[in-house]
């Protein structure tokens, strides 16, 4: 076992009610239209989008989608680790949270955190304010995820909604950390 490896991968997704909105870029990187959604896929010559303290979006506009140029001036939250064990009992309460002592964690820009427990039997989740440092899933809730290989996940996010002549657009910055666990 070599321990935890933290790797940040910056990607972007946009959807305009499955409409073609023309060219869409995030931080200058063009997104590809695929099955109604625009997606930046890391790889090739650009391995990641490097997000800073703001995120710039440009949408050419087409049909019912207006042209949009917007810089969302909040940082994407970063999670470097979770404060959780690698073996988790489904027969008792589980409390875990973001490891705020980890040097890679920079989640101060988050408004909320969505916590998940995923297992072979199902998934459970809770959303809390970013100021809440841990979340507890009860023994009763844990019984729904089953036993075996699973993972814990935290998604810290912030968002704003902008209006373009009646066309509302939500801009969401989200940082996610996933930890593989054994559910016993």
Predicted regions span which residues?
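Beta-strand-rich modules
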Residues: 145-169
